[in-house]
A protein has these predicted regions:
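Ser/Thr-rich, low-complexity intrinsically disordered terminal regions
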Residues: 25-214
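Bacterial Sec-dependent N-terminal signal peptides
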Residues: 1-31
Length: 214
């Protein structure tokens, strides 16, 4: 047999073995256990709650405020819009309580004052709930082309705790009371009041801005 033919014969005989080897490799890959993905734990971003001055204290009282431009809108138009928004979306909001009401309305001055009482939820799940009665005063003043709003007199009270005391924002959510570790962390209990209050303030102010954004 010529050498050339011998080499061809050897190659033909080796081919099936090569295929078997390939198949074994493929099977090994198919049954190779998948690497487990590392579990990731979501970390809450507390940056806005840790900002110094996020809870303003004016003359010893916690007072959130802002002035919003509303170009082209008259005082009367803004007054009517704000009054409607406060009544329907805040006083009659989904978590409102029985004492929430308008306490002063003066169209000539563009003044709206509301005493708000509502539930503030720290946790709301089917099997676990943590909430307080949250009361505060809203003062709005409309002018031609702008309005101002202030939230003050903030108080909290657990209504599912017998003889629960009234908690004042000044004693719970200020930088001094709610921040620890040199301002790098929220205090365990006071921190949840600070977080919840800032979130609710942001929601109330956003509601008013959206109502007047025409």
């Amino acid at each position: 047999m010529k050498l050339k033919h011998l080499l061809v014969a050897v190659a033909v005989m080796a081919a099936p073995l090569a295929h078997v080897g390939d198949a074994s490799c493929v099977m090994a890959q198919l049954i190779k256990p998948k690497a487990k993905k590392a579990k990731t734990t979501a970390v809450a971003d507390d940056s806005k709650y840790l900002m110094k001055g996020a809870v303003p204290v004016v003359d010893g009282q916690v007072r959130f405020s802002e002035t919003v431009a509303a170009p082209g809108q008259t005082k009367d138009a803004l007054f009517a819009t704000l009054k409607d928004a406060v009544q329907k979306q805040i006083i009659e909001g989904p978590d409102h309580l029985e004492k929430a009401r308008l306490t002063e309305v003066d169209a000539a001055e563009g003044l709206i004052v509301a005493s708000v009482e509502e539930y503030l939820y720290f946790k709301r799940k089917a099997w676990s709930m943590d909430r307080v009665r949250f009361t505060y005063q809203l003062i709005l003043t409309a002018k031609d082309g702008s309005y101002s709003v202030e939230m003050r007199r903030l108080q909290y009270q657990y209504d599912d705790v017998p003889n629960a005391e009234v908690l004042y924002a000044e004693d719970w959510i200020t930088d001094e009371e709610a921040l620890t570790d040199g301002g790098k962390k929220l205090a365990k209990k006071a921190g949840k009041f600070r977080r919840g209050t800032i979130d609710r303030k942001d929601a109330v102010f956003a509601t008013l801005r959206q109502a007047t954004n025409k």
